[in-house]
Every structure is written in C-alpha cells, then in structure tokens.
Amino acid sequence: MSIKSDKWIRRMAEQHGMIEPFEPGQVREADGRKIVSYGTSSYGYDIRCADEFKIFTNINSTIVDPKNFDEKSFVDFKGDVCIIPPNSFALARTMEYFRIPRSVLTICLGKSTYARCGIIVNVTPFEPEWEGYVTLEFSNTTPLPAKIYAGEGCAQVLFFESDEVCETSYADRGGKYQGQHGVTLPKA
C-alpha cells in the first residue's frame, strides 16, 4: 500500500470525479485576505468546511449514547464562522463530494493551524467505494469559545492505494453512511 501523489490526485479528480469541486493547486488567499489553505498538496488534499453546522448542547439531554443519539443535542447553524463553546464540539460537512476508488483507503488528519489553537478535527477513514460529503467533527479542547471558518481548509486527506483490490467494499456492504449529503448524525 503506497501513498498517492499530487499528480495521481489531480488525475483521479479530473478524469474520474473523485473530488468535486476540485482545486488542483493550493489556495492560500481569497478576496485579498489570508485563509486556512485548501486544495491539492504534495501527498494529499486539503478539504474545506461547508457553512452548515450542528453545535452540541447539553440542554436537552444528560447522557451521550452513540447507539441512541438524541438529535435535540444539537443546534443547527448556518454561516461563514461557527463559534464552538468551550470544551464542546460541532459537526459540519465538507464542501467537496468524494468518490473513493475500490483499491483506495484514505486517512484524514486535522490541519495544524486548528490543532495549534486546541481545535481538533476528527474524521474516520473513507473506505473503498465510499462516496458522499464527509461529516467533520470539530472539538474545542480549550476553556474559551473557538472559531471555525466555512469555505476554508480544515483537514488533509491522504490517499493510499493497495496492491490488490479488496474483496468487499463499503458499497458492497451497503455502508450506512454511503451517499450522505448533509451533516450526518451517528447511526447504530
């Protein structure tokens, strides 16, 4: 299994629709101001956060249960900047839609710009033949409110291609998050 380069990422995005919309280079400025970068890097792709958020609140529940999650635990928010309360988290989604090839697995890591501020971005791997918008989790580990910027970079996706194609892909299994379009809550 080897990591894939910028050349491979560009080819797969442009010829096979692996990432849509796709940015072939690195974008670091918009409208004359610096932003958290996004687009193709040497061995990965920096994804952007869309402007749809679900901010966690503990007002309506007393326990978090991943097998029986209460959607009233979130407040919906739409905007260019999301403020995450201290020691809390928010869910969002990528601006990009992904179609992962059958021989590829991705790992997604948060950008250091956020990590250095105590904001952790968590995303699970994109499995072979998974497709959809990626649900992102932003954890604010600080005792202060934290900002997340929509339309800017938030995490980097690394693509690994196997020497042999898997026997059963995410699509073959009928994965529960296949084809997700909005910010998707946990499903048991």
Swiss-Prot record:
Annotated GO MF terms: dCTP deaminase activity; nucleotide binding
Provide the reaction this enzyme catalyses: dCTP + H2O + H(+) = dUTP + NH4(+)
Pathway(s) served: Pyrimidine metabolism; dUMP biosynthesis; dUMP from dCTP (dUTP route): step 1/2
Residues that coordinate or bind dCTP: 111-116, 135-137, 156, 170, 180
Pfam families of this UniProt entry? DCD
Give any single GO term for biological process. Answer: nucleobase-containing small molecule interconversion
Please give the superkingdom of this protein's source: Bacteria
InterPro entries assigned to the protein according to its UniProt record, in alphabetical order: dCTP_deaminase, dUTPase-like_sf, dUTPase_trimeric
Class in the EC hierarchy, top level: hydrolase
Recorded protein name is dCTP deaminase
The scientific name of the source species is: Cupriavidus pinatubonensis (strain JMP 134 / LMG 1197) (Cupriavidus necator (strain JMP 134))
